[in-house]
């Protein structure tokens, strides 16, 4: 029967899991990239249903109570189950659901923005292992939902929010063909450069969301494509492949004599490249090359690039040397996006491969970025390897992860005197020729320790020492 759905009624369907305990303790569900956790332990079908219901409620209130919600998913074995559970919650909130099936995260964002939807949801845990999954929510403009609306969803889950009456139950429509519009939009964004004939490109699809779309796009653009891990496979997504494991792509580029290669993560919102010599090309180099091209085209206001605290010092100093403005934010593409919007900047991203170009999209888009890098190389008349050599020399940098299951110790690592003293000693030793960055991951139970300096020996020494201190005092 249609009518008011009370918070009490919906709250009783939530299983008592560590994740729900976190809600009761007022800990935010939304991390740096949506809700994420271990399926069956932290992330369950009942919870996904609740998230769907309160997402529908919040988006209805924010979007004028009109329009559908676009839902997509990656290839994980749990993604369809969670998408169905979430969609049932959306429908119970009176929201129509347009289900894309397998689709990259930026495709969901694009189609949300261009289908008069009140929002979008992606079921994915990005680069995480197959047993994890997550829920990313987008506003009507295709950008990640702001913190205020995320908090409203969390309040609903705690029974602290009043629900709107549903005048009718929402309907569910399976429309995978809508992803074709996203693919066409990427090709159109290249303009007169939408011709990659003569380029041999290796793509590592990570058994994920771009497994079908990206090879089809590059072939239609005229490139010769060698595709790796190019089937949607929920058992193997991100396993020793994709943007976090470049070795197979590097070997394939060399074996095939390819001009370049691109590696995506499971939901294809990030990408890293490999040049024709088999060297990795990270987000810093991609930003430098694309930024220089946009500046030459007078499409980079203030010559500003927005990136994060993880960006290499060599990148920063090289960009400043050519007169550019270099802006750092906290780690997380939503922080980059917010700073870009505040400054009117058009290009930003992360070393990890989340690249945002607001000329074409409001979120990181691995497939679009790869297409533009390939087109940039084609137009330059020289190889990607040569372009990288002409850009900047990165400082030696090491990033090590320490697994700290205790959330309080991980998130409050600054309270560990031994670790803060070791960091201070490293900073004193390196001076302005290096830096240390320690932070708790927003997506995994990891403490990330990064050391960067002009001298590789210093980097190795201090990284090893800091990891040892962290393991001795935080585990």
From Swiss-Prot:
PROSITE patterns for the chain: PGM_PMM
Residues at the catalytic site: 126 (phosphoserine intermediate)
GO BP, sorted A to Z: carbohydrate metabolic process; peptidoglycan biosynthetic process; UDP-N-acetylglucosamine biosynthetic process
Pfam families with a match to the protein in the record: PGM_PMM_I, PGM_PMM_II, PGM_PMM_III, PGM_PMM_IV
Family: Belongs to the phosphohexose mutase family.
Listed EC numbers: 5.4.2.10
Gene: glmM
Keyword Phosphoprotein: yes
GO MF term (any one): phosphomannomutase activity
Cofactors: Mg(2+)
Positions of transmembrane segments: none
PANTHER family in UniProt: PHOSPHOGLUCOMUTASE (ALPHA-D-GLUCOSE-1,6-BISPHOSPHATE-DEPENDENT) (PTHR42946:SF1), PHOSPHOHEXOSE MUTASE (PTHR42946)
Name recorded for this polypeptide: Phosphoglucosamine mutase
Sites where the protein binds Mg(2+): 126, 265, 267, 269
Keyword annotations from UniProtKB, A to Z: Isomerase, Magnesium, Metal-binding, Phosphoprotein
Function: Catalyzes the conversion of glucosamine-6-phosphate to glucosamine-1-phosphate.
NCBIfam families recorded: glmM (TIGR01455)
Cofactor mode of binding and number, as noted: Binds 1 Mg(2+) ion per subunit.
Reaction equations catalysed: alpha-D-glucosamine 1-phosphate = D-glucosamine 6-phosphate
Post-translational changes noted in the entry: Activated by phosphorylation.
GO cellular component, one term: cytosol
Record PTM Phosphoserine, positions in chain: 126
């Amino acid at each position: 029967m249609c009518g008011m759905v009370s918070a009490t009624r919906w709250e009783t369907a939530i299983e008592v899991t560590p994740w729900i305990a976190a809600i009761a303790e007022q800990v935010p569900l939304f991390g740096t990239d949506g809700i994420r956790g271990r399926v069956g332990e932290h992330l369950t079908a009942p919870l996904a249903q609740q998230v769907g219901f309160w997402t529908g409620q919040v988006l209805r209130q924010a979007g004028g109570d009109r329009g559908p919600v676009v839902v997509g998913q990656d290839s994980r074995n749990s993604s369809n189950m969670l998408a169905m559970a979430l969609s049932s919650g959306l429908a119970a909130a009176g929201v129509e659901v347009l289900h894309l099936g397998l689709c990259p995260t930026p495709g969901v964002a694009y189609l949300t923005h261009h289908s008069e939807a009140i929002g979008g949801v992606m079921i994915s845990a990005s680069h995480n292992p197959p047993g994890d999954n997550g829920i990313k929510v987008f506003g009507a403009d295709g950008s990640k939902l702001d913190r205020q609306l995320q908090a409203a969803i969390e309040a609903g889950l705690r029974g602290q929010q009043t629900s709107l009456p549903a005048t009718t139950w929402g309907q569910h429509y399976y429309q995978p063909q809508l992803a074709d519009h996203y693919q066409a939009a990427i090709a159109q964004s290249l303009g007169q450069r939408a011709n990659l004939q003569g380029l041999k490109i290796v793509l590592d699809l990570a058994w994920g969301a771009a497994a079908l779309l990206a090879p089809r796009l590059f072939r239609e653009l005229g490139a010769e494509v060698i595709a790796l891990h190019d089937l949607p496979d929920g058992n193997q997504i991100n396993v020793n492949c994709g943007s976090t494991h470049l070795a197979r792509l590097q070997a394939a580029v060399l074996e095939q004599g390819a001009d370049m290669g691109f590696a995506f993560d499971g939901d294809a919102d990030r990408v890293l490249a490999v040049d024709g010599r088999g060297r990795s090309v990270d987000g810093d180099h991609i930003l430098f090359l694309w930024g220089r091209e946009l500046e030459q085209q007078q499409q980079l206001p203030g010559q500003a690039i927005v990136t994060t605290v993880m960006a290499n010092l060599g990148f920063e100093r090289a960009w400043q040397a050519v007169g550019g403005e270099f802006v750092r934010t906290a780690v997380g593409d939503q922080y980059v996006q917010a700073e870009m919007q505040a400054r009117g900047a058009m290009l930003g991203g992360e070393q990890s491969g989340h690249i945002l170009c607001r000329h074409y999209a409001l979120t990181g888009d691995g497939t679009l970025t790869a297409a533009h890098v390939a087109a940039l190389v084609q137009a330059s008349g020289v190889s990607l390897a040569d372009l990288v050599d002409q850009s900047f020399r990165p400082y030696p940098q090491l990033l090590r992860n320490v697994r700290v299951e205790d959330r309080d110790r991980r998130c409050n690592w600054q309270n560990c005197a031994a670790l803060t003293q070791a960091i201070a000693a490293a900073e004193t030793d390196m001076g302005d020729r290096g830096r240390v960055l320690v932070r708790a991951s927003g997506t995994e139970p990891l403490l990330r320790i990064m050391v960067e300096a002009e001298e590789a020996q210093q980097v190795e020494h201090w990284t090893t020492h800091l990891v040892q201190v962290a393991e001795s005092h935080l585990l």
